[in-house]
Amino acid sequence: MDLPAHPGVLSLTTEHLLVVTSVEEEATAVLSGLTPRAADHVTVGPYAATSVRDGPSTVTVVAGGVGPPASAAAAATALALLPCSAVVNCGIGGAFPGKAPPCSIVVSDMVVAADLGAQTDDGFETLDALGFGPVTLDADTALAGACLERLVTAKLQARRGTILTVSTITGRQSRLAALASRWDPVAEAMEGYGVLLAAANFGVPAVELRTMSNVVGHRDVTTWDVTGALDALVQASRAVFASPLPQRLPWIASP
């Protein structure tokens, strides 16, 4: 079923996967896993995006910016303008100590807005504790399961777990200990909650997928492996999105 075209936006079928990254380097890695296939450079509102087609299936990749507000705005814009059937937030991230090896892949079963709340003399209170809404969002079970299954089939090192979304990256041991105790997370990044909240508001299944570039805690960028994590993101993209894409993605119900 084709939906009406929007000005400057490619008109696509309902078998349409939206991938949201934060920066262009991550978007390039995702697209590298999708080559060689026909790609169209499209405009999605104010965002430049790339759509890759495989028969009736399409993957649109957009770099929406860093942080929860930017990622939520980008995802919501794309979902308002494109007939997306599923959303994946992709990028690199940090692993909590002992939870995921360097350059391995984490697929979310839950995302948490971990620093959204109030810091008081008695400690940190989450937004839901203050009565202003949930700070946790579950990933779509079928979508997360399909992603993990494809990664494992491709013999990539991957696991599922809780991914924290933060506005300020954790670089102190005291905060690391507090977050680990509160949420038992596997990884930390800056966009997942924003993307999944936008998807939830549109009723579209979503999941976060991260490749590990560093260990959360003391901030020493000399120990990070950004290149390795981006290479792992290429492999993850190839496994999840381009195996090749079937005529109907396994997590998408018929319209």
Predicted regions and their residues:
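Short acidic/polar active-site loop segments enriched in Thr and Asp
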Residues: 85, 186, 205
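Glycine-rich phosphate/pyrophosphate-binding loops
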Residues: 202-216
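Metabolite-binding pocket within alpha/beta catalytic cores that recognizes anionic/polar moieties
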Residues: 2-138, 145
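His/Asp/Glu-rich mid-to-C-terminal helical/loop segments that flank catalytic regions of hydrolases
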Residues: 216-255
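Hydrophobic/aromatic beta-strand patches that form the interior of the parallel beta-sheet core
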Residues: 62, 88, 106, 159-164, ...
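Active-site rim beta-loop-alpha module in soluble metabolic enzymes
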Residues: 123-187, 194, 198, 202
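Glycine-rich beta-alpha junction loops
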Residues: 23, 94, 111-112, 165-168, ...
